[in-house]
Each structure stands twice: as structure tokens, then as C-alpha cells.
Amino acid sequence: MVVVSQNYPTPDLHRVRRALLSVFDKTGLVEFAQELHAYGIELISTGGTSESLIAAGLPVKDVSEVTGFPQIMDGRVKTLHPLIHGGLLGVRDDPSHKAAMEKHGICGIDLVVVNLYPFEKTWQSGADSQTIIENIDIGGPAMIRAAAKNHAYTGVVTAVSDYDVVLAELKQHNGCLSFSLRRQLAARAYEHTAAYDAAIAAWFAQDLEVEMPSWQNFSGHFESMMRYGENPHQRAAFYRTRDTRFGVATAKVLQGKELSYNNMNDADAAFELVAEFDPQRTAAVALIKHANPCGVAEGQSLKEAYLKALMCDSVSAFGGIVALNQPLDEECAAEIVKLFTEVIIAPDATEAACNIIAQKKNLRLLITGGVPDPRCGGLTVKTLAGGVLVQSRDNAVVDDFDLQIVTKRAPSQDEMRDLQFAFRVVKHVKSNAIVYAKNSATVGIGAGQMSRLDSARIAVHKAEDNAKRMGLTESLTRGSVVASDAFFPFADGLISAAEAGVTAVIQPGGSIRDQEVIEAADARGLAMVFTGVRHFRH
């Protein structure tokens, strides 16, 4: 711990006499430096930054002129010198600091303008390890942290977007920066270096295949404030992380009202579900409400899939999210706008489809640029009071499972197709989850119940109600198959499904009463498949 024996008054306004500029991103650099020069501010710079300023006709002192020491080791050592860091860290009102600065010829630096080597961009480009390591900035973060620590006297700029803010203050205060701004810039500086170091740590963890490192860092760039969170009394914001997985975060909002917290959460759930279906093989549509599906279907076209999905629960679909695994086309768009919908999320959209959606000015249309790979790894995070739960993404795909037929009767080809379809869907339903499906479409969904039997009954009840609305004489579950996200702990859930008219069952298995459940299935002529994989979702 450093003990300061005397407190010195922090100047509210501090004149900027000397600025050090060393940037990788040279956007707006020359114009900014020209304004600094107009205030009589001495410019110190390094390498390529110095060359850019000299080319623009600005008087610049190279760092090596200040230090009397050339840059060495391919530029790795340029600013790591007492004559630079003394100028950044010196407390101007401390007599001992002033004496040391005078003794060693250290000039105070009042403004530091630094942005860093593009480490994350280099990592994401697929560069080799050596190139990535060479893009770990050392001198830049050191200067940023030093200037931020000494923000009582030194301003630090780490973002091009802050150039105008600084210039406005210099104009307002006749060449001075206020303590308020210096403190704000210092806070942003530490946010910047923390995120930079977090990215480096994440790369090393990935490179060394350390899935759960001793320290886990989560960083994201502020993207936007939201009107509120899940409820109006909660504040919320959206932060973009380094994850490039296609979805809400990568999406362009082509039209519609501002996205809410719940819109984004639901759209993410919807798109992750629909991504379970290969867009090269089939068209698929998912309808989501409160992060749970109320209808999912495959079809030869998006229109067919949408209409099949809507049949599952058209009441709950009102005011929901529509997710597509293929580009939105004119025919599907024409159907979607017939029902009030909050958000459409798709990998792309045709011009004709966009024109139709434009008729509903409040309807948000999100274009993601692609469909995420359901097999792709990654981490999911859940916050707790005083901690964070981290787990690998549930990237198990039913196509890859070694399915075990455990009943006397094997499922038919059509039943097996529907069983696999239903198990794709049940993966994305809140536990306890039960999904009834027929002809590659859900016909009943039971979600989020404490009892698996209750989930099964709710799914049947909704299917029966929907059949009545459609004028049908029997439940939609007749002739369907059923999927369960976890094993049936007792035979009652399976018996309930059999009474609803199912012909085949897919579930993980693994209960101590599996044999009892198998016998109940055999007694009712059901085919049953064990996946060996559970899909709890909370």
C-alpha cells in the first residue's frame, strides 16, 4: 500500500501544455492533432503516429528525442522509460515530485492519446499464435494506466469517439480540461485496459484448451441502453461480447420499434431453437413467447413451416417472436403480418419480403447474417448472489446420438423422423418439458412444471383446446409422438401420453424405474427410444 503523507488540492481546471499521441487506429488523428496544435499544445509521438502527423505538416517531437534513447527490439520498447512515465505520473503539487522532475529533466505530460494494437481483431482473423502475441500491446496499456492513475493532472483518451468531447472542453475552458472530464476519461481508460487484458487471458485459455480457468473474465462493449429490463422498474443495457455466433447480437435491425430486453431475450431463444434445423435440408420456423416455444415446424417452404407451427397454439403466438432458419421470403412474410408479431429474426430477407413487413411499421425485423451451428461450443453464464455459474453450451444434437430402441416394437420411419424432430424442440423448452409432435410439427407443448406429469397433461390440454378451435373432433395428439427432456421417473407420464394417443416416445432414459416404463410402453404397443442425453433447461 502506498501511503501519502499529505493531500494536495486537485485542480478543477488543468491546462494542457503537452500531449503524447501513440495510436494504432489513426481515424481522425490528424484533425484532432491540428486542433491541439492550434491551442499551442506541444505534440510528442511515436512511430507511425509521428509519421502521419509530420506528413500533415505538424511539428512533432519523437519520443526518442524526449528519452534520448532509440526505440529497440522491433518497436517493443519505445515509451517504457522514466522520462515518459515520470511525466505521466508526477504529482505536480508535490514538492518532492517537482524536485525529482526538475533534477531528471522530466516534463509533465498533460494529455495522453493512445489506442491499442488490435488484439481481438487479430485473434478473430485466424492468425497464427506468433502474430497474435505480437499484437499484445505493452507500452500502450502502461501509458494509459499511468495517465489514468494521475488523472488529477493528466487526461487520457482511448477512443476516437472522445476526440470531440476533449476538443469541446478545450474550447470551453480556453485550453484546459476539467477534473470531471479527466475522471470520466480515467474510468473509461481502465474499462478499456481491463477488457483488453480479459481478451488476452481468454485467448490463452483457448490456446491452452483450459475450459474453466482459475479466473474467469467477462467483458462486453456497451451497445445501447434499453427502455427497461424484464419489468419497467428495472434498468437494462445491452453489451456486445467478442462472441461472433450468429444471433441477436450480430443482427441488423432493418425496421421497427426499439428492441426491448424481453424482445432480445426471446429472439435469442427463438433463433437458437430454429438453428437446430439445417437450412440446407429443410425450412423451419419457431414461434416463441417468454423464451418458450409455442409452435415449431419444418416444411418444404417457410410459409408451410410457419402455418404448421402456428396451428400448434395460435393464441399464445399472438405478440410473439418468429424465427426462421432461411431467408424470409415474400410468401412467408405475407402470412406473418396477418397476426400481431413483435419480432421476426432470420438470416436474411428478400426485398419483396421487406416491402411487405414495412406495412407494419412497429414490427421489428432482425437480419443476423447467418445461422449458428448447434454443435458449436462455447460457454453459458448465469449470475447468482455473490457468484457466477459457468457451463459449456448444450451443443448435443440428436442426429449424433446412438439411439437405443428399448421396446418390443421399433418406431417406423415416419415415427423416427418425428421423434428426432420433437427431441430437437424439447431441448429448448423450459424444464420439465414435454413436446408432442406429428408430421414434423409440434402439436402440444408442456413447459416449466415442477412435475413431468403436469407438463404432459398441460401439453395435451392445449392440444385438445386447439383442436376444438379448429373444429376437429379429436385431439391433435392422436397419432403423434412425444419427447421428454429428461427420463420419466415413473410410468405415469408415459401412460398419460399413451392415453393422449401417442404411438412413440423419445427420452434420455436413466431412471431406476426404466424397466417399469418400458413395460408400460410395451403393454400399450408404443415404440420407445432412449437417447442417453438429457436436456434440462432452466
Swiss-Prot record:
Listed Pfam families: AICARFT_IMPCHas (PF01808), MGS (PF02142)
GO BP of this protein: 'de novo' IMP biosynthetic process
GO cellular component, as recorded: cytosol
Gene Ontology MF term list: IMP cyclohydrolase activity; phosphoribosylaminoimidazolecarboxamide formyltransferase activity
Assigned EC number: 2.1.2.3, 3.5.4.10
Domain of life: Bacteria
Presence of keyword Hydrolase: yes
UniProt domain MGS-like: residue ranges: 11-158
Pathway: Purine metabolism; IMP biosynthesis via de novo pathway; 5-formamido-1-(5-phospho-D-ribosyl)imidazole-4-carboxamide from 5-amino-1-(5-phospho-D-ribosyl)imidazole-4-carboxamide (10-formyl THF route): step 1/1; Purine metabolism; IMP biosynthesis via de novo pathway; IMP from 5-formamido-1-(5-phospho-D-ribosyl)imidazole-4-carboxamide: step 1/1
Listed PROSITE patterns: MGS (PS51855)
InterPro entries on file: AICAR_Tfase_dup_dom_sf, Cytidine_deaminase-like, MGS-like_dom, MGS-like_dom_sf, PurH-like
Enzymatic reactions: (6R)-10-formyltetrahydrofolate + 5-amino-1-(5-phospho-beta-D-ribosyl)imidazole-4-carboxamide = 5-formamido-1-(5-phospho-D-ribosyl)imidazole-4-carboxamide + (6S)-5,6,7,8-tetrahydrofolate; IMP + H2O = 5-formamido-1-(5-phospho-D-ribosyl)imidazole-4-carboxamide
Keywords: Hydrolase, Multifunctional enzyme, Purine biosynthesis, Transferase
Record note on domains: The IMP cyclohydrolase activity resides in the N-terminal region.
PANTHER family registered for this protein in UniProt: BIFUNCTIONAL PURINE BIOSYNTHESIS PROTEIN ATIC, BIFUNCTIONAL PURINE BIOSYNTHESIS PROTEIN PURH
Family statement drawn from the similarity comment of this UniProt entry: Belongs to the PurH family.
Protein name: Bifunctional purine biosynthesis protein PurH
Originating organism: Bartonella bacilliformis (strain ATCC 35685 / KC583 / Herrer 020/F12,63)
Gene: purH
